[in-house]
A protein has these predicted regions:
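Alpha-helical transmembrane segments of integral membrane proteins
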Residues: 2, 111-125, 184-479, 483-484
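Membrane-spanning helices that line or support transport/gating and their immediate boundary helices
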Residues: 8, 25, 29-37, 121-125, ...
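Generic alpha-helical transmembrane segments of integral inner-membrane proteins
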Residues: 9, 13-25, 106, 110, ...
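Hydrophobic alpha-helical transmembrane segments of membrane transport/permease proteins
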Residues: 15-64, 172-178, 338-372
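Short hydrophobic, aromatic-rich alpha-helical segments embedded in or entering the lipid bilayer
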Residues: 44-77, 461-473
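An internal, D/E-rich "acidic patch" concept
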Residues: 59-121
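Alpha-helical transmembrane anchor segments
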Residues: 133-170, 174-179, 189-202
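C-terminal transmembrane helix and the adjacent membrane-cytosol boundary/short C-terminal tail
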Residues: 483-493, 497-506, 513-514
Length: 514
């Protein structure tokens, strides 16, 4: 096993070296970075050319420059990273430029990847369990459509209809009666298709979901919820109950009375602690408070499960602990919506509630309120995350469906059914785990594809992150060069001397006459 892991690690390093070499050489040969200066009539053009050639070692072939840069990368292992400098950014170190952009890109990519995996696998499993149903055909058609869509087109459509048109709707949020009816019927059809079973069961599912969704939308419209949204303790209770129902259904089933009792106690404790948590969130106004509350509620859930779990205390504790940890989501949403009025007053009127430009609002970033900043980040991340998620979601749906169908036809699944195990136990405990093995193999590839899509998405939504940095570097056609440690001091002197000779200086990436 150790030999196998070693071989894989060595192969990974070799792949990284070859890939970085190819990208570096392609970038270096994408164009002449001195082309504008060569045709310039500026009297200092030749001095500027000499300066840039000395700073970036343009007098050396790209292969030698690559190994010079690779030496700076290798120094990262001893804590002396040197990825070179970016002349386009006023000789800013590349490591600083990447550090400022990497956080926003990872935030966006991780959110899109996690949501795509969770939602895609859930939809894929339900379509596999309802094979050849109307629901299966509709989802199959939609996934093929989504998988074929170009990312830039999806991003532009979301920007138009998900932000511009939706912000116009929020100016006068009135929902026509026919829209409520159509949405209710569609949701009822989806619910009846997922539930399946006999005709009577389908009709009950269709009617209950359609009436519930239609009534909820009508209530939100009448109470003008879209003008001043809020959750409150009632919303926290409903979201917590929905989360608990999903977890119990997939984990133990509602027939497990001890699990239902333990989860019920956790829900009651969450609602009982809602008011004290208001003071905690007010005085501990920090993102770490979310982690603290999640750990606290998960610990309470595990403790309750161990107390009331009986012989199956491990399963009950796991279920109750998971429900307890997830209760932090409605609590955080409640805190964010409490800042809605302040958020609306601080954002520029031209931006709208659903933002289409940048990763945050500068006026809100300066406010020392973690919940307000979370709300601002959520409105800015919503559309880019959906744009990145929708294509990956289609892929995960298809893979999950095919994998689960293959596993469900295996002999050990038939044996489990023959022994009298329930369908939920067969699917969740035996089939689901093995069906996830092929999914795990494509996550790394999909993560790289999402990063590639982020380059385009960030440009559409004007995010100053890795995508915009990549575009900027490609357009400038300037490859950074790492420097040996003993050459840095001499290089600084050379840059000062070249500036003095040229009679100009670099200011924010622009040449200024002395």
């Amino acid at each position: 096993m150790l030999t196998f892991v070693t071989r894989r690690l060595v192969a990974t390093v070799l792949v990284l070296l070859v890939a970085s070499f190819i990208v570096y050489v392609l970038t270096a040969n994408s164009g002449d970075p001195l082309q504008e200066l060569r045709g310039s009539r500026d009297p200092n053009a030749q001095d500027k050319i000499a300066y840039l050639s000395g700073v970036l070692n343009l007098d050396q072939p790209p292969v030698l420059r690559y190994f010079s840069w690779l030496g700076g990368v290798g120094a990262c292992f001893i804590g002396q990273c040197d990825l070179g400098i970016s002349v386009a950014r006023g000789e800013q170190p590349v490591i600083d430029a990447i550090g400022g952009a990497l956080g926003s890109t990872l935030q966006l990519v991780l959110a899109a990847t996690i949501l795509a995996i969770v939602i895609g696998v859930a939809i894929g499993m339900t379509t596999a369990l309802r094979q050849y149903s109307g629901y299966d055909y509709v989802v199959t058609f939609l996934t093929l459509v989504f998988y074929s869509l170009p990312i830039f087109w999806v991003a532009v459509l979301l920007k138009e209809f998900g932000a511009i048109r939706f912000n116009e709707f929020l100016g006068d949020p009135v929902i026509p009666w026919w829209s409520i009816v159509v949405i209710a019927l569609v949701m009822g059809f989806i619910a009846s298709s997922v539930v399946g079973g006999e005709l009577r069961t389908r009709v009950i599912s269709f009617a209950s979901v359609a009436i519930g969704v239609g009534g909820l939308i009508f209530l939100l419209d009448v109470t003008r919820w879209f003008v001043q949204p809020s959750i409150g303790i009632l919303g926290v209770a409903l979201l917590t109950l929905a989360t608990a129902a999903i977890v119990v259904f997939t984990s133990t089933g509602f027939q497990h009375r001890r699990a239902v009792i333990a989860v019920g106690i956790v829900i009651a404790l969450t609602l009982g602690l809602w008011y004290p948590f208001q003071f905690l969130f007010f005085y501990l106004n920090s993102g770490w408070t979310v982690l603290l509350v999640a750990v606290l509620m998960a610990g309470i859930g595990v403790a309750v499960g161990l107390i009331v779990g009986g012989d199956g205390k491990a399963v009950v504790a796991r279920t109750a602990g998971l429900v307890g940890g997830l209760t932090v989501i409605p609590l955080v949403l409640d805190q964010m919506f409490l800042r809605w009025d302040e958020y609306v007053t601080r954002i520029p009127l031209s931006n709208g509630v659903i933002a289409t430009i940048g990763a945050s609002t500068p006026a809100i970033r300066r406010v020392d309120d973690a919940w307000l900043n979370m709300l601002d980040s959520m409105t800015h991340m919503l559309l880019p995350t959906i744009a990145l998620m929708i294509i990956s979601l289609a892929a995960y749906t298809r893979y999950a469906r095919a994998s689960l169908l293959d596993v469900m036809n295996q002999d050990y699944v038939r044996t489990a059914r023959a022994k009298g195990l329930g369908e939920r136990t067969v699917v969740m405990r035996h089939a689901f785990r093995n069906a996830m093995i092929p999914i795990a193999t494509i996550i790394a590839l999909d993560f790289g594809a999402v990063i590639g899509g982020a380059v385009i998405t960030e440009r559409v939504f004007a995010w100053q992150a890795m995508g915009s940095l990549f575009n900027e570097c490609c357009n400038d056609r300037l490859n950074p060069r790492g420097q040996p440690k003993d050459d840095r001091r001499n290089n600084r002197k050379t840059r000062k001397r070249n500036r003095a000779v040229a009679g100009c200086r670099m200011d924010g990436g622009q040449w200024c006459e002395a």
